């Protein structure tokens, strides 16, 4: 079940996007247009003859497109969607023992977990597969709709459908959602934070990493610029600590601590680490 907390777009400027589609997919495009309109996004439908790599190269501006695989974000000759089905090989290799994130979040105890920095949902997908009950919170209407579409497709996949009921999508601002939990005196087992944009001036290692981000993340950075719709997550740490016994923060291995707060415990990997804060 998806939940709308009414605050998803409260801090976002008005959005307007082109949506490209071949005529065979007009009905689907109109559906996405209506959904996005209900979330404050004006979508201009643009039927085209052929949605292919050449068209994307000739139309480099940030836009949406629709084909047989659903809704995509496109720019600079590339297109992106969360594509949860592509994560299946990774999931099949994963276990509670092999995954550092499983140890950090104590997934063996099947926790109720709020992922307050959704991104493409890949970490939440893994955590749900390993047993967690996930509340996946995203405030950007376009990214939320992409996640919603990926979940809808996953529900028709024989493998992914087995645990889709463990992922609840919540259209809300994460800070507002955590504040609401606190005001209602509700708690969860874990809050998971994976801020997408470490502070560049204090984290030169992260700068080098960001130069190598894969195509999905390049497009996500265009949709969620650091000085616009995407924040750095620092303010979420204190809010998270009020509602969870355990807060786990994923960071590049050499990044500074989130909000400059030293964690109680760390799990170190080759490329990233998990910082733990306990209540």
Curated annotation (Swiss-Prot):
GO MF annotation list: rRNA (guanine-N2-)-methyltransferase activity
Family: Belongs to the methyltransferase superfamily. RsmJ family.
A Pfam family hit: SAM_MT
Binding site for S-adenosyl-L-methionine: 138-139, 194
Annotated compartments: Cytoplasm
EC number: 2.1.1.242
Gene3D superfamilies, sorted: Vaccinia Virus protein VP39 (3.40.50.150)
Organism of origin: Acinetobacter baumannii (strain AYE)
Role according to the record: Specifically methylates the guanosine in position 1516 of 16S rRNA.
Record's protein name: Ribosomal RNA small subunit methyltransferase J
Leading EC class: transferase
HAMAP family registered for this protein in UniProt: 16SrRNA_methyltr_J (MF_01523)
PANTHER family: RIBOSOMAL RNA SMALL SUBUNIT METHYLTRANSFERASE J (PTHR36112:SF1)
Catalytic activity: guanosine(1516) in 16S rRNA + S-adenosyl-L-methionine = N(2)-methylguanosine(1516) in 16S rRNA + S-adenosyl-L-homocysteine + H(+)
Principal location listed in the UniProt entry: cytoplasm
SUPFAM superfamilies, A to Z: S-adenosyl-L-methionine-dependent methyltransferases (SSF53335)
